Amino acid sequence: MITNAALIPIRNSSTRLPNKSLKKIKNNLRSIDIVIERAKKTNFFVILTTSTESSDDVLVDIAKEHSIAIFRGSLNNKIKRWYDCLKTFEIQNALIVDGDDLCFDYDIGIRSIQQLTSSSSELITHTKNIVPGFFTYAMT
């Protein structure tokens, strides 16, 4: 059983900007590299959650590069992918870090899991005083 995990849902088949996670921000630094490194700062078990589509095969290699876990599931049903990942890895608490969220604040993520585990809540979302994009969801 994994007590706390950071799930990074991402896929490359976006219609608005395909392969956006692979876009280079500076030199050879891809946007997904930034998100993964920020998620690792939580010290939670980090899992890249993607689809079983061939367009997402490259994400398996990226997970290996960063020494994080990979989970492959539904392409179009992100919530099912989360659920299946939670069940497969037997995760007690999960922090969702959007794969294109370069501004994710890992400290807020850590505090959200702390709040989640110290209360009877099942879901925590951002409050009005936190800019959306710095934090998404924590759930048990």
Language model features by range: what are they?
Residues 64-77, 87:
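Conserved donor nucleotide-binding strand/loop of the catalytic core
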Residues 30-46, 61, 65-66:
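A short, N-terminal amphipathic alpha-helix
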Residues 3-8, 32, 45-48:
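Hydrophobic targeting segments
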Residues 51-56:
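A conserved acidic beta->alpha catalytic loop
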Residues 1-18:
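N-terminal nucleotide-binding beta1-loop-alpha1 segment
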Residues 43, 91, 118-122:
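Short, high-confidence coil segments that cap the C-terminus of an alpha-helix
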